[in-house]
Amino acid sequence: MKKKHFILLLTIILFAIIPVCFNIFWSAADDPRYIFMTSGAYTGTPSGSLMYVGSLYGSFIAFLYSITVNIEWYSLLYYFFFILSIAIITKKILWANIKAEIKYLGLSLILFTHTYMALSPQSTFLAADLSIASMALLYRYKNRINLIYAALVFFIATQFRLFGALMPYFIALPIFFLNKGVSLSNVRKYIVPSCFFILLSAITFGSDYIRYNSTPEWHEFKKFDAARCYIADNPLSYKLSEHISNPQIRNL
């Protein structure tokens, strides 16, 4: 038992010092932009209206920045929830009733993948990781406390990226029925909570829709963001810069 706690503690410490000891680069352009928006670097006022992040979470970060901008709240919360998901998944593997070889193979895989995620963070990765952590809490849960924890972790995942949180459940939900099959007790144990998680997703989507369609300014920003995404996702977008520097280029 002491060995398991030592490994869990060592894992948490390892991933806690990575962002302190190494240069971290966000793997997507969205996250640095969200840091500027929530901190007020763009407009001078912290804003929680973010395109792909849940409005509740965005408002919470903006509130923290309104208290002080001397703390990098966006990154700090990111790594807090990142370490939380690692701790949950690692603990589930360590305490699982499986062969030691499979257990340490799983831990090695967790170490490898999460080291990359720690050095090159992205909110979509974190949403999926938190979703997997909620599945770990849900799998063979023994009491309602674990179910509540699983629901809370999943809701946090939807605030980072809604579809990033849903995807692991779409893929891995059949795993819950490997032991007992699709029995009535199994359906009650896993399908009912999954339906509740879908309700949480609907709440996230609904609150975001209301927030992001309630002001004309946000409507105009969505038009701008749609054009930005089109340019960023266009494989020929590099020619746009050539066209700017050389107006003679017409065939884009």
Where are these regions (language model features)?
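Short hydrophobic alpha-helices at membrane interfaces in multi-pass membrane enzymes
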Residues: 100-105, 139-155, 188
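Perimembrane helix-loop-helix junctions
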Residues: 167-199
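Aromatic- and kink-enriched transmembrane "portal" helix at the membrane-lumen/periplasm boundary
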Residues: 106-132, 155, 159
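Extracytoplasmic loop-helix module adjacent to an early transmembrane segment
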Residues: 8-50, 62-65
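Membrane-proximal stem/loop segments at transmembrane-domain junctions that anchor or position
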Residues: 209-252
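Transmembrane-helix motifs of polytopic, lipid-linked glycan transferases
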Residues: 80-97
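Membrane-interface alpha helices of multi-pass inner-membrane proteins
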Residues: 147-162, 173, 194-203
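Short hydrophobic/aromatic helix or loop-helix immediately within or flanking a transmembrane segment
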Residues: 47-72, 76-81
